[in-house]
């Protein structure tokens, strides 16, 4: 964050905290409380019921927005699982369309992973049973319906999975759910003039992703969480379809990162800014012992489409209000043992070239600028990709961000461009029936994922594993990204990861590897692969 932005935020915050107590109470009353997802744990028989259903939420005055949720109107419960124990989940689909439930971050066999082949038809049920054999972590579950994932997530489907183990239970970490152990699911939303979720998969969103003009935290705009005075644990999930975030605290105090996607780090890592990609999770500790209220804010990012108001300046997403109660006073010096990286000499290597059809690149950028103006380009010029030397600076019809008479799907009367397979890996769009390769169970592989020649942001996710990042976008990984991960950043350069698959995945239910910008995934930037013994 630029110093001037911090000063602005700090001044605003200071004005609020200098108010007399009675008006501070009135100010607090203006905040909605942060909704805390209910904990859902296996019953005495090791079972959990999950109902995928329609619902409604009031985000705008006098308007009910139609939404989808798991066991409720929106989002879902936090499913709490224990390492070493099996669970059986009975899933019922009460939606009007088919869906799947993918267990993002869980190391489980392909047949229960919930990829696009594992469709649950409307009115149908599916039962999955698996044992949890991985370290404590914050994971999540969400749809993975081919070509429909972006829409189904935008409608509200998503929930947390909390894995506990002996390390997480014995370490002196905040553990009171909804008190000092706080889930923070961040998602942007776009509503139409009728107050309904305005989701379109078109040439623009296929190129840059679907993005909103408001931010929700656990489904509520800018809520407040009252916490004890002490160390507070935030379990952060970027649940956005396409928007990367960069989180900070409004008064500039540090956050201590204690866990990434796949579990606890070796020791807390101090950061003042925390970039978090779509689908990623981080756990951070925040020191509230001084009793001062503060905001979790998302800072501006340089990503196409994501620079528009209100995201063009620091945007508060959660007010943290310490009470008089005394909370955890301990910051652990060390957490868990992270194994040394395995020797990659002689291991199987694979190459993944992420690419967008140049025509989609061109049409998508044109549609973005036509709809939102040059500000949406995040500082990139218009010859990004294949747009040649178009000089938009002096075009009279571009001055107001309009391109007169342009149909976003057609150019010069040509047939509409079919973008449904325009995003690819190694030149191929996703196939539901042809896995791209077979990996061997328990064997390390080194994967290189390249975004060279494509300046788009691609958070690359691999099913069925927690991997280690060797290099990220051409550089050594940041310290807090050196633990267990299931998403790596690819943006115009190469990333290298060390993967290993402990379970089998047959051709009927292969694992997926894909871009977690959901509209890229839905338009082909995904492949299936098998794991055999």
UniProtKB/Swiss-Prot annotation:
It is found in: Periplasm. One of its GO terms (cellular component) is outer membrane-bounded periplasmic space. Its cofactor is Cu cation. InterPro entries: Cu-oxidase-like_N (IPR011707), Cu-oxidase_2nd (IPR001117), Cu-oxidase_C (IPR011706), Cu-oxidase_fam (IPR045087), Cu_oxidase_Cu_BS (IPR002355), Cupredoxin (IPR008972), TAT_signal (IPR006311), TAT_signal_bac_arc (IPR019546). Cu cation 1 binds at residues 102, 461. Gene3D superfamilies: Cupredoxins - blue copper proteins (2.60.40.420). Residues 53-166, 221-290, 416-532 form the Plastocyanin-like domain. Multicopper oxidase involved in copper homeostasis and copper tolerance under aerobic conditions. Is responsible for the oxidation of Cu(+) to the less harmful Cu(2+) in the periplasm, thereby preventing Cu(+) from entering the cytoplasm. This is Multicopper oxidase CueO. The lineage of its organism: Bacteria, Pseudomonadati, Pseudomonadota, Gammaproteobacteria, Enterobacterales.
